[in-house]
Amino acid sequence: MIDNKINEDEFQEPFVFKTDWKNAFNDEEFVKVFSSDILENYIINKRWYGGKASTLKYIEVVDFFKISSKDNTYFGVLLEVNFKEAFYQHYFMPLAFMSEEELDTNTIIAPVKMNNVDGFLVDALHQEDFRKLLFEEIIHSKGTSSKVQFHKGNKLEDKEYISSKFMGVEQSNTSIIYNNTLVLKIFRRIYISMNPDYEISRFLTERMNFKSSPEYKGSISVILTEGNITLGLMQELVPNQGDAWKFMLEEVDRIFENLNHKKIKINKLPDIDLFKRLKINEVPHEIIDWAGLSIFLRIQTLATRTAEMHIALGSDIHETAFTPTTYNGDYTVWLKNRLTYQFQNRLNILENNLHKLDGLALELANQFLDHKKEIRKLFLDFDWTKMKSERIRIHGDYHLGQVLVNGDDFYILDFEGEPESTIRDRKVKQPPLKDVAGMFRSFHYSIYATIFNNKDKYPYDQKELFQAGEILFKYFVGVFLQTYTEVAQGGNLNIGYKKEIDFLLKYCLLEKAVYELGYELNSRPRWSVIPLTGIASIMEFEKHN
């Protein structure tokens, strides 16, 4: 039993049911009370619940499965959350019924009495017995034909269960560390389709033997007539020193501190064009003196791993989900519809939030509104008949936060795709340069976040820091791009020639920056200067090329 007393003040009385726990989800009365009176109050406060911006209408139990250990019966419940705004989302919730003595947690869903037995409904992942059961089911999976299927990856050795614990802060999924060597990610938000994270992770490990992402070890799925739902993904726990976002913030902070330490004159720093490719020995010595050599070597390594990921994702000719494909009319219609809708949405948000902006952000916002016709035209100018490169499955949500630092190397993770996109859209084959553009936007963010978060630390005005930041950004892009194109083309990945590469990068960067603009305007308007600067520099590039 845990030390903390359970907080029963939230509940006046336990919910009383005639049914026993083992038959609970076959009992209409239990299901009705559970999905309304019990669950609604609980779910809206969970970190993984994605409907906070909408109004919950009702929750429905759409399916369930039973799974038992030696001592306990657990239910895996599939929920459909319906919203007043006329859409729905699906969630997975594993449930346990425990007496107070058996509880491993003080986070309870509700006190209940089942067939005269007192106890508590809890999220089963809080119970060690359940976590151990999942581990053993994956290790000993026999590929049975039951509704819930456990798969043991061919790289998973038989192991004894030793320990399990939650991994860090709970986000949109819940991750459990086993034996300090494995991670099981439980997907809370689920889709009636294979999760791309599972699909790509297994493909990269078992088909391509790709070494720069965590090894696929196993999975949990539910097999329904409508399709297979991925509930869990087990991977190796990669030794690391944190993510590349944290690493880059520290590096950029050091670089900005050097401005003062080394008495660097910002207006004398050599500038270059956006997308100008550079080998490290072509980076001017003034830039190396300011930023240091090591950051460019690390960017080279990241570019190499990114290209190797794309080569692995785009070199299978047998598995149709991963075969490279050309551009066509259908893809173009899909792309333009998606982008014109998104662009219009961002325009509306900007017009409604203009009063929150000032200074450079306001100036750039007005410039954006003045150029809306040209930007829309740029999105509509996508001519697939001129494209000679190929589309492949990509990471889809690629940024510094999706990369782990391990010594001098990097691991790439989280292949779930862009959170705002539908599951079908996440599986559409896209230009690999879309991932590259995502990383470039992340570089841009790391530079501006450093300026915003340390504004009193560097003895320069913001305008000068922005100027230095833009120069630094272009050198990061140039070194990354040189290495990426060399490695990608050397691995027979068809990304096109220079003109096409520049066009696709410009297109994807614009798409990313417009996407970010909506987020920033809604949550932190001061930061909207970051995507607005990105949009302005692409429009500038467009004017001169």
Where are these regions (language model features)?
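Terminal low-complexity segments of carbohydrate-biosynthetic enzymes
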Residues: M1-F25, N522, P531-N545
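An alpha-helical support segment within catalytic cores of ATP-dependent transferases
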Residues: N154-I162, R346-I392
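Contiguous mid-protein beta-loop-alpha structural module that forms a pocket-lining wall or clamp
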Residues: I2-F11, K57-F65, F75
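Conserved ATP-binding subdomain of kinase catalytic cores across diverse folds
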Residues: F64-S68, T73-E351, L400-Q402, N406-G491, ...
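ATP/Mg2+ or Mg2+-diphosphate-binding catalytic cores
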Residues: E470-L493, F503-N545
